[in-house]
Amino acid sequence: MLLNQQLVQQFVTQAIAFGDYEQEDNIYIQNQLLRILNAIGIDVDNESPLNQDATANAIAQYWIEQAVNENYLEDALYKKEIVEAQILDLITPRPSVINRNFVEAYKKSPETATNYFYEITKRNHYVKEDAIANNINYEVETEYGDIEITINLSKPEKDAKQIAKAKAEPAKHYPKCALCIENEGYQGSVTQAARTNHRIIRLKLDGKSWGFQYSPYAYFPEHSIVLSEHHVPMEINKQTFVNLLAFIEQFPHYFIGSNADIPLVGGSILSHNHYQAGKHVFPMDNAAEIERFTMNQFSSVTASTLNWPMSVIRLKSENRDELINAATYVMNTWNQYSDETIDVRAFSKDGERHHTVTPIARYRQSQYELDIVLRDNQTSEVFPDGIFHPHEDVQHIKKENIGLIEVMGTAILPGRLKEELQQVKTYLVGDNQFDLGIHQQWAENMKRTYDINKQNVDDIVDKEVGYKFKRVLEDAGVFKNTDTGRQAFKRFIKHL
């Protein structure tokens, strides 16, 4: 395999412009490219196959495809990702340089600092904008406000060979998980993501060391992860609120929140303490207040319930310390609270804890805000997946845990729905009747409800998906939006 000389020079120019290199390093960079791609030399005879303004990532993708076509690289997703990360590491400054530059940029403003880091992660294809653009996104109007629907098509599917090879691989213990700080610069394997071009900003939250990185497959603008330096389990306690507000103090243009810390109502990774942050206004942010109340022991804190399908208490204050204490009080009270009339139980008979919260922090209108979303992970014979989990009749749309992002009103729906929903639409407007499997009853209900034709079928199905997600959130709410549920919520507030 030979690398086109003009492409090499285009890449070298960008490595010098964006990486740690100077003009005298051009031969060194060229030889690193030959090593990474297992190439045998430089093609000096042919014109560049790409435009002069091709990005480093576009050049890397061209070389990877060339290497596969010429049998220099196995056509396996993980092998291609490892090579891509190694190539694009050459246009990425070292972690120490990025951290130093981040601190300098922060002196201008927090937003200048995050913009600097975000641009690097997009340029070196750690944040995969091209893949993220494949997601299907739209909004649906509901009585709670507009909710956001995302059908997740960004993450590439592993093929059967890679899955089989991964199963045969011996268990790896370094890094311990996908969030560990040791992933920075890690080569990757069939079971672990390629992270050679990965960089982490070091932060202090309440005097402790944390890392800040962007998410490769973002669900919203500047989707970032704040991770503990140590591999310790998720835990929601007073320190969580301290950390969230410490982050907001440093980066007031971002929100930050945490998944819950117990199964069924938490995120997919409970083994490593982390939060998610970013620059997005979620539907729940704009939810209207229903009832304001005060807690006498926290005079500077205003509290309210929200017009939202899940059960949320919003706390606001200019006094950060009192807000932390109020949030801790609400959480501790909820963690011990039971109401048998609505199947809310803090503990099972054997003492297992069932209650926790999903907290979200933001800085708005010169006040700190903490949204405390009440969670309960009980199961029952009637609801084996969870009493406050998507029930069986909506699981054809969403059956996974309802985590932080969904709680705030953004559905992350599985990629299978793209094809399945197209089949539903074909069924609704066609004469040919065929079995839709898990979507059959839903489709029949739509046929009875609407006068459907080819002009309106897309809007109807999109809207009904939104209504299903609204139901998903209502299922996850502990105090339902019914007379009984509202009275029960008032009893809890009185208990506070």
From Swiss-Prot:
<dbReference type="Pfam" id="PF02744">
    <property type="entry name" value="GalP_UDP_tr_C"/>
</dbReference>
<dbReference type="InterPro" id="IPR000766">
    <property type="entry name" value="GalP_uridyl_Trfase_II"/>
</dbReference>
<keyword id="KW-0119">Carbohydrate metabolism</keyword>
<comment type="similarity">
    <text>Belongs to the galactose-1-phosphate uridylyltransferase type 2 family.</text>
</comment>
<dbReference type="InterPro" id="IPR005849">
    <property type="entry name" value="GalP_Utransf_N"/>
</dbReference>
<comment type="pathway">
    <text>Carbohydrate metabolism; galactose metabolism.</text>
</comment>
<dbReference type="InterPro" id="IPR005850">
    <property type="entry name" value="GalP_Utransf_C"/>
</dbReference>
<keyword id="KW-0963">Cytoplasm</keyword>
<keyword id="KW-0808">Transferase</keyword>
<protein>
    <recommendedName>
        <fullName>Galactose-1-phosphate uridylyltransferase</fullName>
        <ecNumber>2.7.7.12</ecNumber>
    </recommendedName>
</protein>
<keyword id="KW-0548">Nucleotidyltransferase</keyword>
<dbReference type="GO" id="GO:0006012">
    <property type="term" value="P:galactose metabolic process"/>
</dbReference>
<dbReference type="Pfam" id="PF01087">
    <property type="entry name" value="GalP_UDP_transf"/>
</dbReference>
<dbReference type="GO" id="GO:0005737">
    <property type="term" value="C:cytoplasm"/>
</dbReference>
<keyword id="KW-0299">Galactose metabolism</keyword>
<dbReference type="GO" id="GO:0008108">
    <property type="term" value="F:UDP-glucose:hexose-1-phosphate uridylyltransferase activity"/>
</dbReference>
